[in-house]
Swiss-Prot record:
GO terms for biological process: regulation of transcription by RNA polymerase II. It is found in: Nucleus. May be involved in transcriptional regulation. The gene is ZNF449. It comes from Gorilla gorilla gorilla. GO terms for molecular function: DNA-binding transcription factor activity, RNA polymerase II-specific; RNA polymerase II cis-regulatory region sequence-specific DNA binding; zinc ion binding. This is Zinc finger protein 449.
Amino acid sequence: MAVALGCAIQASLNQGSVFQEYDTDCEVFRQRFRQFQYREAAGPHEAFNKLWELCCQWLKPKMRSKEQILELLVLEQFLTILPTEIETWVREHCPENRERVVSLIEDLQRELEIPEQQVDMHDMLLEELAPVGTAHIPPTMHLESPALQVMGPAQEAPVTEAWIPQAGPPELNYGATGECQNFLDPGYPLPKLDMNFSLENREEPWVKELQDSKEMKQLLDSKIGFEIGIENEEDTSKQKKMETMYPFIVTLEGNALQGPILQKDYVQLENQWETPPEDLQTDLAKLVDQQNPTLGETPENSNLEEPLNPKPHKKKSPGEKPHRCPQCGKCFARKSQLTGHQRIHSGEEPHKCPECGKRFLRSSDLYRHQRLHTGERPYECTVCKKRFTRRSHLIGHQRTHSEEETYKCLECGKSFCHGSSLKRHLKTHTGEKPHRCHNCGKSFSRLTALTLHQRTHTEERPFKCNYCGKSFRQRPSLVIHLRIHTGEKPYKCTHCSKSFRQRAGLIMHQVTHFRGLI
């Protein structure tokens, strides 16, 4: 029966060619990436670029999503922790996803389930018959059970029928292929015992029926017995433990139970089956539970010292904001965001300008402010070469060149680059002026216009020059004033190359050129 188990596994391995329908390029690229050596490159730069190229060929980030790439990495680790023979068998089938991997292992278990039951029934029958027949066996007559050991490069052994002798030859003779030679006919018909019993009925009712049958009584009275040749009890316990833990990877090799070989192979395989890291235990446990809840369970009779008990991993849910401001109750996803927000309540401005001493809440605000002193305009238009201090200003300017005007007024047909510009324009048709001054009752279409107007009543001048101390109501007025101190003249005449601080000065200057033409 053990021969049948080995044949079933070999037949399953031979079916690998049937599943070779998937593209194997992914496996080839994976092996190239894992096996790449530093000595294959001329230097660190070339080695890094080569690894990057091989990784992209394997994972294909432009074609796969993040979840698909993670699935590939988890599948690779899952195959790595499998026993070597099972890993090789699964890779031969080229599984394309986790469902396929789990399905392949389940199919192998189902295919080998019947041979496993046959081996168990055979062992139980020998245990029942051995005490009765051992006393009547000739001294030189021994029926040796074939050795069970971890599947390796074992030769395929065909299933043969065993003849039960009456007087028996001196010993069982095995051929070169491990095939048992047939005994002579004992001279009377022998009953055929059906060994294919289900696991549920291994203790009842077939045992009682077998003991009460007439044929069995004749068999027991004919001085026929069996003797199991086992070297020692330790090998027997190792064999049973092996069959319990790995019932689907045993095969037939040799003609006796070889205790040292069995023990050596078992210890090697047991050492290979290491507990994966905790972060992988959670993902692999979820993978197994989704496909088959019983696949990842530890066998009842196994003596594993540390069974796989994955611990739940706490993850942040999307949109979760655990950091709460104690002053206003506003929540943030990151602690750094909460720290920056709390500076609004405390009035802290840790970032100071070294030129004028002005302080800012954020470092980005300080960086933009320093461009006023340096005159830096890092964002340049590729069409007209005009430069800007902010990227958003450049994007809005580029729309004037591309004529990208997606916002159109339905009243007059005029188009705008920004939705806010269209909204302000619509107020000219409706005459709407929702923003009203409470001091004089004057109304305005824009909130900014109302804010500037209210400063005439309060005499507020919030924009102060750090060079001379002069204050202004509007920020643009301060910017123009600062050009006096910095000497900046951004408006240049295209005819005579003369520069001006204000656009109005450039326009008035250009009139002189036009007068000469007239």
